[in-house]
């Protein structure tokens, strides 16, 4: 009898016998403005804090790779992003509801 994967308490998807977990990723992005501004306005610009929700494809020392869409019966991934680790503030694994 084939071995069945254990049910996880976290939201995930299994593709080709590999489990990918769903995360809420909080990260910082550049904010730009090409208009003229005085010093006070220029110094007041701050990076944008962004939220992305996606499946974690893989991560290494420098990058986190995610996907949001996939082919159910094959290893085809869409809506992909690569986040430099230095930009990621927090990664939260999402519980299954």
Q: Can you annotate each of these PLM segments?
A:
Residues 2-97:
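Conserved RNA-binding domains used in RNP assembly and mRNA/RNA metabolism
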């Amino acid at each position: 009898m084939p071995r069945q994967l254990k049910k996880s308490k976290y939201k995930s998807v299994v593709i080709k016998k590999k489990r990918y977990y769903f995360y809420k990723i909080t990260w910082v992005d550049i904010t730009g403005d090409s208009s003229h501004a005085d010093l006070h306005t220029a110094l007041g610009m701050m990076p944008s804090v962004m939220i992305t929700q996606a499946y974690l494809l893989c991560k290494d020392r420098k990058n986190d790779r995610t996907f949001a869409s996939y082919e159910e019966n094959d290893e085809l991934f869409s809506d992909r992003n690569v986040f430099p680790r230095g930009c990621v503030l927090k990664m939260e694994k999402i519980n299954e509801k």
